[in-house]
Amino acid sequence: MRDQFISLALILCVLHSACGLYFHISETERKCFIEEVPDETTVIVNYKVELYDPRSNGFMPSSPGIGMHVEVRDSDDKIVLSRVYSSQGRISFTSHTPGEHVICMFSNSTAWFSGAQLRVHLDIQVGEHAIDYANVAQKEKLTELQLRIRQLLDQVEQITKEQNYQRYREERFRHTSESTNSRVLWWSLAQTVVLVCMGFWQMRHLKSFFEAKKLV
């Protein structure tokens, strides 16, 4: 049953290695996304910013004055990438530690466009989904069969990374569980010692009280 669960988790990871969406933000708003990434894995972020036009009641391509500040932090909260890009672009980075990577985006707000409503189209691709195989085949002059073999090898490598990441998560969870159980045990022992000491003190106090009243 456990192996089936791990296999299902790996399939879901592969299926969700690429996602496309869009969201609305104001020009001073910050949006962050969490992506679980194995170590030594390439992540590519494609984005496009559109500006709301009240006259047409729709969104149009943003002006050159609007750009996006992109910041990426790894699972240790270290900054992997932080810079200002144009209103449309492609960003890539490689993870060096496994875990949750936080991708934050916000516009480089200016007084002219302050408070404007923006629509951001976002597409995040992880692992072998981030590889442009058409470009690889052209550069390396690969045949269709060679390209297919290359894709299969990359998929196997990505699955191996996902398995290693799942083991890493299991190890962290086990360590957290053991640490929690240990703390609960020591806390229970401490409570027991306190109760025993209080009981002993109460017995001594009652004995002294009865002796003072000459009841014993």
Curated annotation (Swiss-Prot):
Keywords: Coiled coil, Developmental protein, Endoplasmic reticulum, Membrane, Signal, Transmembrane, Transmembrane helix. It is found in: Endoplasmic reticulum membrane. The keyword Transferase does not apply. The keyword Signal applies. Residues 134-164 form a coiled coil. One of its GO terms (biological process) is dorsal/ventral pattern formation. A motif (Prevents secretion from ER) lies at residues 213-216. Pfam families: EMP24_GP25L. The chain crosses the membrane at residues 183-203. Residues 21-182 are lumenal. It is a single-pass type I membrane protein. Residues 30-126 form the GOLD domain. GO terms for cellular component: endoplasmic reticulum membrane. InterPro entries: Emp24-like, GOLD_dom. SMART domains: EMP24_GP25L. Residues 1-20 form the signal peptide. Residues 204-216 are cytoplasmic. Belongs to the EMP24/GP25L family. Eca and bai are essential, though not redundant, for dorsoventral patterning of the embryo. Specifically required during early embryogenesis for the activity of maternal tkv, while the zygotic tkv is not affected. Involved in Golgi organization. This is Transmembrane emp24 domain-containing protein eca. It comes from Drosophila simulans.
